């Protein structure tokens, strides 16, 4: 069953994403709106059959949605203790909005818009 960790400090939230990407997790969705990383942000990472979703707002900080076992591993690796609660950035409708506003990553990578592979 998936759980949602809430109120994660921005620096910790960003460092978890960076560490997972360095560990081989692949970005399968990313919010590319003009306010990405300023007001709101969304990332979806996958490795094998595992999936982790990250939501962030500058008002409510970071959120992470994943299986309990994955969240426990993240707590151990990053020496933190997550709080769990009602999400703001990772509500189903908000995620759908992020995904709708995002270009598929294969398009970005195919045309290499940012001069690097994402």
Where are these regions (language model features)?
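Terminal, regulation- and interaction-focused segments at domain boundaries
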Residues: 1-18, 22
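Intrinsically disordered, low-complexity regulatory regions enriched in serine/threonine/proline
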Residues: 4, 72-118
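Short beta-strand-to-loop capping motifs
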Residues: 5-8, 47, 64-68
């Amino acid at each position: 069953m998936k759980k949602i960790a809430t109120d994660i400090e921005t620096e910790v939230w960003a460092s978890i994403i960076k560490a997972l990407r360095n560990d081989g997790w692949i970005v399968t969705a990313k919010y590319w709106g003009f306010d990405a990383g300023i007001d709101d942000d969304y990332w979806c990472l996958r490795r094998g059959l595992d999936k982790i979703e990250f939501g962030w707002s500058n008002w409510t900080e970071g959120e992470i949605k994943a299986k309990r076992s994955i969240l426990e591993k993240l707590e151990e690796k990053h020496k933190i203790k997550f709080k769990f609660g009602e999400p703001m950035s990772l509500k189903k409708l908000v995620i759908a909005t992020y995904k709708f506003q995002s270009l598929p990553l294969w398009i970005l990578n195919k045309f290499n818009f940012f001069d690097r592979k994402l």
